[in-house]
């Protein structure tokens, strides 16, 4: 009764926040930092790539506290490259047409400047305690931006929202994806998958930051490699359609009415809004989630982690999400695909109830193998996201309850999180999904406000590090 009453209210709040307020805030902060840093995402992209590929030995050795820069990036990518990269691309294409992918690229480009600022601020405001424990994330730069009661209120609001959005309900959503896909593709009962998942997660969670970092730095390259290899096989098999696929992305970015119907104005608005929304919530730039990971990095200067953080957005959107989109478009929308020729009919009736990715990969691998491949990718993506989101939530729980209660808080938080993870594998609720989206939307507000307020700190850090090369 309560759920049925609240569901339409929460859905309406989400619609208003995501369609109006958040798009303008997140795009706005990306534009702002792009201009104020004179497009740091362009000028420092090469530097970020060199660091990513190990020129400065980012992997390092075992850490007594915190993470290496690579481990921090891997933990951030684990959060960014989740089920949203599969669902996000297909959802954007379904609603906004292939042209929505172009607008995803535009959003990600500006998002790279935003995440540079987030990572820089996370490094500048982090606290290293006497025992070596590192505390850092948006709550710390929010209270730096705003002193007194207002800052504490914004930080507390952010902390509660992210605990609910990512630490508890968000992990439940991810585990539901694991449970349902593994049962469908491999016949594994969801409750068995739930028990296995809880045991594995418990072992990792109880090992602290170092154990989680050791896992993410290994699992992220593996999961990305598997998905990229599968996607490249599809593109190789459909190589003759790849040029046309890129052509459709660019053409329908500005002429979307030809494929999604409606008037030009409505179709263009739909393509842009779908690309923007899906892109923003895929790479998480401006949401305040990944700064928790970047704060843990042991680097010489905050700028170093800022440029590395930009590579996370690049990998998430320009590599993984783009490859997924190319696979979908070149198998389903080109000449001999089921959605070719400006298709505007009932997609569910045409393809059945299977999702676009299963159909796309199944067109080359075969239906059974295609479904299994997508299921394995979802398993990796969702599992790695659970690990990162749990850490982000725990950091905020410890902030709320203080250092004296941190051990007890961590234990209680972990137990509750494991319960949500198990429940997610065996049950699903559209209302929980809506609540998760709502709290995801809400965490953006205090984070973006602080990002605007601390522009001077970001610019000073950039000038300090590169005063001879990038005087702003």
State the predicted function of each range.
Residues 5-6, 36-41, 84-89, 167-179, ...:
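Transmembrane helix-loop junctions in multi-pass membrane proteins
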Residues 60-94, 121-124, 130-139, 143-145, ...:
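Alpha-helical membrane segments and immediately flanking helix-loop junctions
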Residues 110-118, 195-209, 220-240, 273, ...:
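Selective recognition of specific alpha-helical transmembrane segments in multi-pass small-molecule
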Residues 39-67, 91, 97-100, 113-149, ...:
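Flexible loop linkers connecting adjacent transmembrane helices
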Residues 25-29, 36-49, 158, 175-182, ...:
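Membrane-interface loop-to-helix entry segments
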Residues 116-126, 130, 232-248, 256-263, ...:
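Extracellular/periplasmic helix-exit of transmembrane alpha-helices
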Residues 29-34, 107-132, 139, 143-176, ...:
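Helix-loop-helix module between adjacent transmembrane segments
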Residues 1-83, 93-100, 111, 422, ...:
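N-terminal alpha-helical transmembrane segments of multi-pass membrane transport
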């Amino acid at each position: 009764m309560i759920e049925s009453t609240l569901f339409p209210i929460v859905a309406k709040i989400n619609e208003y926040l995501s369609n109006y307020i958040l798009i303008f805030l997140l795009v706005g902060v990306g534009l702002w930092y792009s201009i104020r840093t004179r497009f740091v995402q362009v000028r420092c992209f090469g530097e970020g790539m060199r660091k990513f590929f190990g020129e400065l030995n980012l992997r390092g050795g075992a850490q007594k506290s915190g993470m290496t820069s690579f481990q921090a990036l891997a933990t951030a990518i684990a959060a960014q490259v989740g089920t949203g990269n599969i669902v996000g691309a297909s959802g954007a294409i379904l609603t906004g047409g292939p042209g929505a992918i172009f607008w995803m690229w535009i959003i990600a480009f500006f998002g790279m400047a935003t995440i540079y600022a987030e990572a820089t601020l996370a490094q500048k405001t982090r606290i290293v305690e006497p025992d070596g424990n590192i505390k850092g994330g948006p709550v710390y730069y929010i209270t730096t931006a705003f002193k007194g009661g207002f800052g504490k209120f914004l930080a507390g609001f952010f902390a509660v929202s992210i605990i609910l959005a990512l630490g508890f309900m968000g992990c439940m959503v991810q585990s539901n994806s694991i449970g349902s896909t593994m049962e469908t593709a491999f016949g594994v009962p969801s409750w068995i998958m739930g028990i296995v998942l809880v045991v594995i997660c418990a072992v990792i969670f109880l090992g602290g930051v170092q154990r989680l970092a050791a896992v993410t730095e290994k699992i992220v390259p593996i999961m990305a490699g598997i998905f990229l290899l599968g996607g490249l096989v599809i593109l190789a098999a459909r190589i003759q359609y790849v040029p046309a696929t890129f052509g459709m992305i660019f053409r329908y970015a500005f002429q979307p009415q030809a494929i999604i119907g409606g008037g030009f104005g409505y179709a263009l608005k739909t393509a842009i809004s779908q690309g923007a929304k899906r892109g923003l919530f895929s790479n998480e730039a401006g949401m305040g989630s990944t700064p928790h990971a970047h704060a843990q990095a042991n680097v010489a200067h905050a700028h170093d982690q800022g440029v590395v953080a930009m590579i996370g957005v690049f990998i998430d959107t320009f590599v993984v999400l783009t490859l997924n989109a190319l696979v979908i478009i070149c198998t389903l929308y080109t000449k001999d695909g089921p959605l070719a020729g400006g298709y505007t009919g009932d997609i569910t009736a045409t393809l059945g109830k299977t999702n676009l990715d299963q159909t796309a990969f199944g067109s080359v691998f075969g239906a059974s193998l295609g479904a299994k491949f997508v299921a394995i990718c979802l398993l990796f993506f969702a599992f790695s996201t659970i690990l990162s989101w749990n850490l982000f939530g725990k950091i905020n729980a410890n902030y709320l309850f203080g250092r004296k209660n941190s051990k007890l808080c961590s234990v209680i938080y972990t137990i509750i999180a494991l319960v949500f993870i198990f429940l997610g594998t065996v049950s699903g609720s559209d209302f929980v999904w809506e609540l998760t989206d709502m709290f995801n939307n809400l965490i953006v507000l205090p984070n973006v406000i602080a990002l605007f307020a601390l522009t001077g700190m970001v610019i000073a850090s950039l000038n300090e590090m590169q005063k001879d090369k990038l005087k702003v």
